[in-house]
Amino acid sequence: MIAALFAVDNIGSMGWKGSLPWPHNKDDMKWFKTITQDQIVVMGKKTWDSPDMPSPLPGRFNVLFTNKFIDRDDVEQIKGDVCEALKSLKQNNKRKNIFIIGGLNLLLQSKPVLDRIYVTRIQGEYLNDTQINLPEFLDGMRLHQTVNLGSCSVEEYHNDTVSRSIKTNTRKRKEQD
């Protein structure tokens, strides 16, 4: 599975001065850790450099999507076409889920290959310099479930088109063999 995983407030705020716009949210962070533990997390350079982000994230395979090489052995660095890179990463790691965790540009570029989108809803409206048009980003996705975490909630969306496409391509390959 290739999934986007991010949090927004009531107006789509995602970032403020390289950080999250709202105060630390224990419920969201606990859920984030649970779902990404032992999986692959993919992020852009600004997310990697965020003061809110321990880099690398412990207990996960960290992938940095950047054109600017950093001298680190604890992260895989990739560049080029986002969708092709994500498909290749999935092909080489079939037993792992891939979570794109930010920033906004990486999320937007990855949309064509997303199987799922997980949106944490943080209540309130916060100052931001990074904002997503959530209705536009979720276009073509189907709400599967909403989970209440206490101080926030998580909405899980499925992309039936991508899932069907993957299954169809698998069937075609089997028929050709």
State each model region's role:
Residues 1-177:
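Enzymes that bind and transform nitrogen-containing heteroaromatic metabolites
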